[in-house]
Amino acid sequence: MSIYDDIFKQFPTIDEWSESNEKIMLEPYTHLGINTAKELPSMVTKAFNHWYQVPQPALDIILQIVGPIHAACLLIDDIQDDSDLRGGNPVAHKVYGVAQTINTATYVCFDAYHKISKLTPFSKSPETTDLWSIINDEIAALHRGQWIDLYWRDSLICPTEEEYLRMIHNKTGAIFRLPIKLLQALSPVDSPPDCFPLVNVVGILVQIRNDLLSLSPDFTKDKGFCEDFSEGKFSFPIIHSVKADSSNSLLIDILRLRPKDEPTKRKALRYMKDQTKSLDHTFDVLCKLEKTAKEELEKLGGNSELSSILELIQVSPIPEIADR
């Protein structure tokens, strides 16, 4: 008897989804090998709950939302940047292919998205419209920021520092704001403090810190040597260097080439360090941002857990990063 003799009987079987299928489908995601609970967005979320006092079960669900979304973004970022390494290992799409990795990243995002409904019992009202709006708005902001970053890269348009800050306010800031907004929406505290100036500063601080660390020997082990040059990316130090001397096209020419060889990238790095002092400038900006974050934290009455995180992400002096 053919399965087509009574096709309707086949639907339940066709719709079944086994644990083995799920495990295989998630392999590009698990390949990342990251503990989402120890990633910065999750750590920051737990620290900010000091002010919002959301019950642990609800906090756990929020972490189950932000962690996978952040990981999915890393999978997509690696594809869009044509990266080779993450955490010292081959990136997922080099192992499983671009198509499977995109599909898995999308699936992980939707799976996290569906967890919003689990927050309903903790909501201040039976309606969860605000919760859906939060995730919709911040995911949209993330994609807008990512788009303009890619647009600058692919069009070889160097933004101003102000434009770059607005971009990372969306792209990086969204992954920090999303869980904090969920905490705010679910908080049993009558009048929780306004933490968003601090959240936004932390997002900007983290991205510019990553931009500087991408030039360090330690980061080379994780992502390769000065990969921003190979990716043609306008990072914060590169933007400063290009704008510092618009008559010198060295960096633009190197970004256009997207070099893989170390000598070319070392030449660009030395120019940024010695000629335009862009690493010094970036370090100075990070120090100002750290100071601002600590001042905001003090205004909010302090938070030992968040203070520890700020100490953890504090940048090293320039000589330890660039002299080699």
Swiss-Prot record:
Query: One MF term from GO for this chain?
Result: lyase activity
Signal peptide coordinates: none
Q: Which InterPro entries match?
A: Isoprenoid_synthase_dom_sf, Polyprenyl_synt
Name the reaction it catalyses.
(2E)-geranyl diphosphate = (E)-beta-ocimene + diphosphate; (2E,6E)-farnesyl diphosphate = (3E,6E)-alpha-farnesene + diphosphate; (2E,6E,10E)-geranylgeranyl diphosphate = (E,E,E)-alpha-springene + diphosphate
List, separated by semicolons, the cofactors it needs: Mg(2+)
Q: Which UniProt keywords apply?
A: Lyase, Magnesium, Metal-binding, Transferase
Annotated Mg(2+) 1 binding sites = 77, 81
Enzyme class comes to: lyase
Question: CDD domains recorded for this chain?
Answer: Trans_IPPS (cd00867)
Query: In the record's cofactor note, how is the cofactor described as bound?
Result: Binds 2 Mg(2+) ions per subunit.
| SUPFAM superfamilies, alphabetized | Terpenoid synthases
Q: What Enzyme Commission number(s) apply to this enzyme?
A: 4.2.3.106, 4.2.3.46
Q: Which one GO biological process term can you cite for this protein?
A: isoprenoid biosynthetic process
Give the misc comment. IDS-like terpene synthases originate from a geranylgeranyl diphosphate synthase (GGDPS) progenitor in fungi, after the split of Melampsora from other genera within the class of pucciniomycetes. They lack coupling activity and act as classical terpene synthases.
Please name the PANTHER family in this protein's record: GERANYLGERANYL PYROPHOSPHATE SYNTHASE
Q: Explain the purpose of this protein.
A: Terpene synthase that shows monoterpene synthase activity and produces (E)-beta-ocimene as a major product, using geranyl diphosphate (GPP) as substrate. Also shows sesquiterpene synthase activity as it is able to convert farnesyl diphosphate (FPP) into (E,E)-alpha-farnesene. Finally, TPS2 can convert geranylgeranyl diphosphate into (E,E,E)-alpha-springene.
The name of this protein is IDS-like terpene synthase 2
Organism the protein comes from: Melampsora lini (Rust fungus)
Q: What is the lineage of its organism?
A: Eukaryota, Fungi, Dikarya, Basidiomycota, Pucciniomycotina
